[in-house]
């Protein structure tokens, strides 16, 4: 069982202490103040980057260089000398990129990046005793690991595989030449994503730096105008303002709900020994709902930073309005109204789902669902609670798929039946996610077992019975069209 850090160490920071007076004034841990300050500075820098370093005014080399320098400054401000881990990993993997053969470049990069990340996860927990509440260097290291492995696989696709062996998406994203050192550093360490992500594709990033990003996306959706130079350049301001409003609301909800419904309530003596079964399920749902706004805040703010810089355009919707969701990491409305486990996971931590698809789900020849869950758990860290969550997610995913394939079609014959089905499946989905994700925030073995014992392991038992006794109706779409999000569990 992972040792929990002492309370006095749970919020310590390794970064700058210049905002310590503000931290004391607000009553918010310094590491979190540094994180938010860096993201707000990044937002300001993003506006400046889009206006004053527009591709029409600055060369790609200048944009790459400034994006990298700002990113390095922000990560050092937040994490101090621990930022060296990011620089070491990026430089090591660039060495792999330029020296390894294209037939093995993806394998070597994957094992070096994941190996280094795992060693850092172990050291920060078992040696340095950093708590889960500490905003430390492992977060950026996780994002960099995604980027390193994504790029390595895409270079392998572009240089080491035949075009006919690639799926349509792999062909679109294949990288046909190894990146220069400046491009590599900029892609991994740029100020927009180095603190909070998300992972993005190398071709999209380079197109953004070179000023081809928006035009490329418009041409992908067959935008018909007088020519390439006459294509419009939509403003991201509407999307940025909307996302900043969501960010502010998420922050207020987090500050309110996390204090009213702390995770520790799930191991409280009253909850475990005195509350009735239905009360336990209700409080489990409420506590897990209260834990979500912090993710909404961090991911939506990161999305706004990219959009403010002009990155994240994704074409036009059916009404002809600009879409700025290329790098969005979640869809809050679809999460909160999801009527299936699959739908929920498809809209949570979207870019990590895309990464899992790229490096695991579409690549492995056996047991893609199980191996994707295990990779996701390993990427998150070595707390036992992560593995409880992801291993619980496997039977829940399989059981949900079996129920849907066997019964859903019976409820589509009338509107009333469909509404009833949607209401029931919404309630079951939200409860199943809360049950499955609880160990993720509890971390250790003892509180996880205590929680599951208090609710009699009911979902584990139900899922196993469904898998054992419901007839299997195989659903076998093409490998390239399978979504990893249907097998990916809720991530941090």
From Swiss-Prot:
Keywords: Acyltransferase, Endoplasmic reticulum, Lipid biosynthesis, Lipid metabolism, Membrane, Phospholipid biosynthesis, Phospholipid metabolism, Phosphoprotein, Transferase, Transmembrane, Transmembrane helix. The keyword Lipoprotein does not apply. It holds the Pfam family MBOAT. It is found in: Endoplasmic reticulum membrane. It catalyses: a 1-acyl-sn-glycero-3-phosphoethanolamine + an acyl-CoA = a 1,2-diacyl-sn-glycero-3-phosphoethanolamine + CoA; a 1-acyl-sn-glycero-3-phospho-L-serine + an acyl-CoA = a 1,2-diacyl-sn-glycero-3-phospho-L-serine + CoA; a 1-acyl-sn-glycero-3-phosphocholine + an acyl-CoA = a 1,2-diacyl-sn-glycero-3-phosphocholine + CoA; a 1-O-(1Z-alkenyl)-sn-glycero-3-phosphoethanolamine + (9Z)-octadecenoyl-CoA = 1-O-(1Z)-alkenyl-2-(9Z)-octadecenoyl-sn-glycero-3-phosphoethanolamine + CoA. Pathway: Lipid metabolism; phospholipid metabolism. The chain crosses the membrane at residues 33-53, 69-89, 125-145, 179-199, 237-257, 296-316, 370-390, 423-443, 452-472. The modification Phosphoserine is found at residue 486. It is a multi-pass membrane protein. Its EC number is 2.3.1.-, 2.3.1.23, 2.3.1.n7, 2.3.1.n6. Its main location: endoplasmic reticulum. Highly expressed in stomach, epididymis, and colon. Belongs to the membrane-bound acyltransferase family. This is Membrane-bound glycerophospholipid O-acyltransferase 1. The gene is Mboat1.
């Amino acid at each position: 069982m992972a040792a929990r850090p002492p309370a006095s160490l749970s919020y310590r920071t390794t970064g700058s202490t210049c905002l310590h007076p503000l931290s004391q004034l607000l009553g918010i841990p310094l590491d979190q103040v540094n994180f938010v300050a860096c993201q707000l500075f990044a937002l300001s820098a993003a506006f400046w980057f889009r206006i004053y370093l527009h591709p029409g005014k600055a060369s790609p080399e200048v944009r790459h260089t400034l994006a990298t320098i700002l990113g390095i400054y922000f990560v050092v401000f937040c994490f101090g000398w621990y930022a060296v881990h990011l620089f070491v990993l990026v430089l090591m993997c660039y060495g792999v990129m330029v020296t390894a053969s294209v037939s093995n470049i993806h394998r070597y990069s994957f094992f070096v990046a994941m190996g280094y990340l795992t060693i850092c996860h172990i050291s920060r927990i078992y040696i340095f005793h950093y708590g889960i509440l500490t905003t430390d260097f492992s977060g950026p290291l996780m994002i960099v690991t995604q980027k390193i492995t994504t790029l390595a696989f895409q270079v392998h696709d572009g240089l080491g595989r035949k075009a006919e062996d690639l799926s349509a998406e792999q062909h679109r994203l294949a990288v046909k030449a190894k990146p220069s050192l400046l491009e590599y550093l900029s892609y991994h360490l740029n100020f927009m994503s180095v603190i909070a992500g998300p992972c993005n594709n190398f071709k999209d990033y380079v197109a953004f730096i070179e000023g081809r990003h928006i035009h490329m996306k418009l041409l992908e959706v067959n935008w018909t105008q007088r020519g390439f130079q006459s294509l419009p350049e939509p403003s991201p301001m509407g999307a940025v303002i909307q996302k900043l409003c969501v960010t502010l609301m998420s922050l207020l909800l987090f500050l309110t709900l996390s204090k009213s419904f702390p995770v520790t309530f799930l191991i409280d003596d009253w909850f475990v020994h005195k509350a009735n079964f239905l009360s336990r399920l209700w409080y489990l749902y409420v506590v897990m709902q209260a834990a979500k706004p912090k993710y909404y805040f961090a991911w939506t703010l990161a999305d706004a930073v990219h959009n403010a810089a002009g990155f994240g355009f994704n074409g036009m919707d059916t009404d002809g309005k600009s879409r700025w969701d290329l790098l969005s990491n979640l869809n809050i409305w679809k999460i909160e109204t999801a009527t299936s486990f699959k739908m929920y996971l498809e809209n949570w931590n979207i870019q990590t789902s895309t990464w899992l698809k790229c490096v695991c789900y579409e690549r492995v020849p056996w047991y893609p669902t199980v191996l994707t869950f295990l990779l996701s758990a390993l990427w998150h860290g070595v707390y036992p609670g992560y593995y409880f969550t992801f291993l619980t997610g496997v039977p829940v995913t399989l059981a949900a798929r079996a129920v849907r394939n066997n019964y859903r079609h019976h409820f589509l014959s009338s509107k009333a039946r469909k509404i009833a089905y949607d209401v029931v499946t919404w309630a079951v989905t939200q409860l199943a996610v809360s049950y499955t994700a609880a160990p993720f925030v509890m971390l250790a073995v003892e509180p996880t077992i205590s929680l599951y014992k208090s609710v009699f392991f009911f979902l584990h038992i139900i899922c196993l019975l469904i898998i054992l006794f419901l007839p299997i109706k195989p659903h076998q779409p093409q490998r390239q069209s399978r979504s990893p999000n249907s097998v990916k569990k809720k991530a941090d």
